[in-house]
């Protein structure tokens, strides 16, 4: 019998070792995430910029100064403005805008892409609301700049802390679908921008980074906690899939990274509620 006839497919590359890396390890059984040799709980107290430096050092990338939110070229802003007028899906707008960027070296491209993404996302959000984009400020951190560019207001320290907690948690997550896509593209000798635009396309999928979308749709459909059981039982009776439950890799009931995210989101939500309650009603939108 030939070797070819003995070969079998492994759906989702399960059980296949496709690469070796020192960047991160996802221990699904224990629910732990190790980033560049450090447990997530160690990194949770640090800024996102610190984690980026750690990952780039582990990868041998010499990107120079610390990463920071960067202004967008006029051509990128024009593309986003046109996309907002046409109500383009935000992930498509992100992919299209990233494709307008270019740099002279891989290290420069890495800094440019990481620095431009918060500006792209915040700018597109403002344009879809009929507001003018804001340039990042040199006196603000990466997380604080995103909040400033998104809202136009001075960011509350607790919200900055919460966003930092989120960003450090998702900075690197093993060989997931979008990372694998980017590595395949880079393996052909292509460039960073092409790899990242391909990765964004993979990230958009509802079985990857796009999963929160259908989950939120379901939350909005339920509307009130009292309706939750009725709505979910009806969906199950129709054979529909319930989004937001289970994970292909994490088997532990409460993975460390999810607990960190929940804690950060809870503190940020409490801060927003407290802040909005102090704003006179005539100033609220």
Predicted regions located by residue number:
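Hydrophobic alpha-helical bundle cores within soluble ligand-binding/oligomerization subdomains
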Residues: 1-285
């Amino acid at each position: 019998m030939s070797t070819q006839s003995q070969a079998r497919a492994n759906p989702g590359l399960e059980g296949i070792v496709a690469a070796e890396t020192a960047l991160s390890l996802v221990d699904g059984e224990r629910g732990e995430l190790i980033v560049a040799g450090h447990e997530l709980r160690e990194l949770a107290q640090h800024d996102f910029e610190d984690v980026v430096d750690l990952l780039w050092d582990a990868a041998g990338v010499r990107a120079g100064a610390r990463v920071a939110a960067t202004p967008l070229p006029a051509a990128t802003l024009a593309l986003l403005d046109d996309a907002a007028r046409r109500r383009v899906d935000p992930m498509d707008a992100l992919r299209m805008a990233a494709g307008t960027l270019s740099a002279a070296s891989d290290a420069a491209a890495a800094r440019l892409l990481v620095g431009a993404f918060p500006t792209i996302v915040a700018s597109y959000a403002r344009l879809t609301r009929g507001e003018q984009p804001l340039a990042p400020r040199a006196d603000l951190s990466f997380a604080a700049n995103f909040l400033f560019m998104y809202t136009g207001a001075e960011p509350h320290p607790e919200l900055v802390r919460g966003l930092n907690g989120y960003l450090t948690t998702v900075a690197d997550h093993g060989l997931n679908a979008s990372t694998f896509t980017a590595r395949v593209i880079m393996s052909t000798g292509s460039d960073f921008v092409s790899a990242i635009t391909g990765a964004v396309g993979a990230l958009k999928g509802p079985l990857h980074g796009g999963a929160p979308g259908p989950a939120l749709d379901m939350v909005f459909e339920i509307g009130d906690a009292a309706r939750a059981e009725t709505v979910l039982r009806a969906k199950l009776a129709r054979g529909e899939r319930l989004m937001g439950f289970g994970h292909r890799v994490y088997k532990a009931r409460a993975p460390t990274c999810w607990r960190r995210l929940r804690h950060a989101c809870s503190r940020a939500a409490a801060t927003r509620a407290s802040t909005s309650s102090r704003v006179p009603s005539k100033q609220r939108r």
